[in-house]
Amino acid sequence: MAGAGGGGCPAGGNDFQWCFSQVKGAIDEDVAEADIISTVEFNYSGDLLATGDKGGRVVIFQREQENKSRPHSRGEYNVYSTFQSHEPEFDYLKSLEIEEKINKIRWLPQQNAAHFLLSTNDKTIKLWKISERDKRAEGYNLKDEDGRLRDPFRITALRVPILKPMDLMVEASPRRIFANAHTYHINSISVNSDHETYLSADDLRINLWHLEITDRSFNIVDIKPANMEELTEVITAAEFHPHQCNVFVYSSSKGTIRLCDMRSSALCDRHSKFFEEPEDPSSRSFFSEIISSISDVKFSHSGRYMMTRDYLSVKVWDLNMESRPVETHQVHEYLRSKLCSLYENDCIFDKFECCWNGSDSAIMTGSYNNFFRMFDRDTRRDVTLEASRESSKPRASLKPRKVCTGGKRRKDEISVDSLDFNKKILHTAWHPVDNVIAVAATNNLYIFQDKIN
């Protein structure tokens, strides 16, 4: 994927360079836990970009309109709305604290002038309406302009209220709250292509909700055994098919993916398809089961493929072939020899996400040291890029990074022993149409775009 010029990636079959566009967030060395970004999501048009953090806040950025005087501005986003989505809670029955951290954000397709999104923490899902107001009503009969009631005996004439222009105000209001349906922590939400329902998944169950109904949901998957000592796997991610409203998939900690069809039965305890790659017995180790756990699953925009991310690799599966993936891309194979120390510092349990580009020809996922990886599915080339303040000059090209595993190290390479495992790219998003990407690095949001000469 990296041509002679450097960090290339497909754009209609041509290589191009990625360049820096923006970085959001403070530069402080001591980052507050609440400021760490926990999810990143473009809306369907790509004009809005939402982030959620561990402090329960949602920040929405709006894309700058491109014009002739600023041809490079299509990768620039400015703050549109900020609101507190979730607050910390306490479950008195179980004596458990419920974090405010936003686990996932999912946009609904836009139906009118307002935008809607779902956000969830470990237990509660909320539907938010994001709307603009640039007019206000004046001239009420019973109230003054400051809201005080007028003396009815002093009202001598009937007034017709009029709308007057005001400064643009963006309001975020909670329209629905979906609660008390999950015993375990919610790890996924996914909006159905019927635009009326969505699913939510925790470790052992998947529920189907209607967007208009908050007091009940349908349990469509339940893998909880009668005896919890017999539990061998948990659900790690779930997603609806982008076009077939009856089909969804869910992945497990054993590295398997099950495709279910809701037309077959109300409770999808029997899958329609079962995707699993046979394990090579010669490479089995103590860590095999941990690193095979799938942390993310994403359908391609076309609906023909799905992508799964485990600890060391990204795999692309054809929905018509269950026996093995059609592509396997190694993300950071050089860490295989470091699994023991990664187990000791708990990094081996990090949950990396993955995403497709708009045409499904390239995929992106994160790594350590603020590195992120891109893979060209057509040419099978790949590139490692870095989200760092050092390369954050306007329109500065990103230079490909290489990790050295041997003894001799070139000047432009970094040794595997000097990687910073506290700097990790877990959450990334790719614009649905353009070559604009958003990369979350701790409390910073980096935005990159393809370079225009």
UniProtKB/Swiss-Prot annotation:
What are its GO biological-process terms?
Answer: cell division; exit from mitosis; mitotic cell cycle; regulation of chromosome segregation
The protein's predominant localisation is cytoplasm
Chain positions of WD repeats: 32-71, 97-138, 181-219, 230-270, 289-327, 344-385, 420-452
Residues bearing Phosphoserine are 285
Record GO cellular component, one term: protein phosphatase type 2A complex
Q: Does the keyword Metal-binding apply?
A: no
Which keywords describe this protein according to UniProt?
Answer: Cell cycle, Cell division, Cytoplasm, Mitosis, Phosphoprotein, Repeat, WD repeat
> Function of this protein?
Substrate-recognition subunit of protein phosphatase 2A (PP2A) that plays a key role in cell cycle by controlling mitosis entry and exit. Involved in chromosome clustering during late mitosis by mediating dephosphorylation of MKI67. The activity of PP2A complexes containing PPP2R2D (PR55-delta) fluctuate during the cell cycle: the activity is high in interphase and low in mitosis.
Q: Which family does the record assign?
A: Belongs to the phosphatase 2A regulatory subunit B family.
UniProt subunit comment: PP2A consists of a common heterodimeric core enzyme, composed of a 36 kDa catalytic subunit (subunit C) and a 65 kDa constant regulatory subunit (PR65 or subunit A), that associates with a variety of regulatory subunits. Proteins that associate with the core dimer include three families of regulatory subunits B (the R2/B/PR55/B55, R3/B''/PR72/PR130/PR59 and R5/B'/B56 families), the 48 kDa variable regulatory subunit, viral proteins, and cell signaling molecules.
Q: What is this protein called?
A: Serine/threonine-protein phosphatase 2A 55 kDa regulatory subunit B delta isoform
- Organism name: Homo sapiens
In the UniProt record, what gene is named as encoding this protein? PPP2R2D
